[in-house]
Amino acid sequence: MKRRHEPIYRAAVAVGLGLFGFWRLRKTVTGIDNVPDAGGAVLAMTHFGYLEFALVEWATWKHNRRRIRFLAKKGAFDKPVVGGLLRGMRHISVDMNAGGDAYTHAVTALRAGELVGVFPEAGVSSSFTVRELKTGAARLAAEAGVPVIPVAVWGGHRLLTKNHKVGFRERFGVPVSFAFGAPVSVTPQDDVREVTDNLRTTLQSMVDDLQRTYPVAGEGEWWQPVHLGGTAPTPEQAIAADEERQRRRDAEAR
């Protein structure tokens, strides 16, 4: 399939590459050959920070120049400048109250041979552990007839994440580790809940492996999960905080 000339996408990638080079990020990638040179696939990614979409594109672009169409919340598309960039890069807007259009657009993109990036946790996990996943990645793969590729990122949350202000100098020289797992085949006959639960187990196992080989000790650090000696919230505390935040938003919207 001949690739389109997409100047906005290429410009955005160039800016990202320049920024990550300026920060002197130390990238380690395993399993990148699992990302096909052509054909559709769902990239199901961990979500511990706000820059994983750009970081994963950084890794895939360096490998084979594949462009990823990310599912992003409608609120981002509603912003004047950001929204224009997202549309220009052909990302997919998701209305959390009515996601049918996004699902249809994603299936169409996958069938056309695109890579579609999704965060099945449906939000940043501030415990820095993989929380319960939504079934969207499995459903998309089954309907479009493409595989799911699990993608784990560790270290990217040290650049920008939820509930923690990262200092300017803290971003320099941060190691960022990536793992691209073996493609998972999903058929319409499969139980998508079971596939999704297995995907969660796989992603957490991949994160565990990245943490074991991470070149910086994180004991006592805000970015390390509590079970490894860090000071991040426990999964239960993170869920409770998210629920309270949602209650406040709902109350303000009334």
Model-derived regions: residue spans:
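Helix-to-loop junction immediately C-terminal to a conserved catalytic motif
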Residues: 9, 16-47
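Catalytic-site beta-strand/loop segments enriched in glycine and acidic/polar residues
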Residues: 109-138
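Short acidic-hydrophobic, aromatic-tinged amphipathic segments that line or gate anion-handling sites
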Residues: 29-30, 92-95, 186
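Acidic, Ser/Thr-rich low-complexity intrinsically disordered segments
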Residues: 222-254
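Hydrophobic/aromatic ligand-binding patch that stacks against planar heteroaromatic rings
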Residues: 85, 108, 139-143
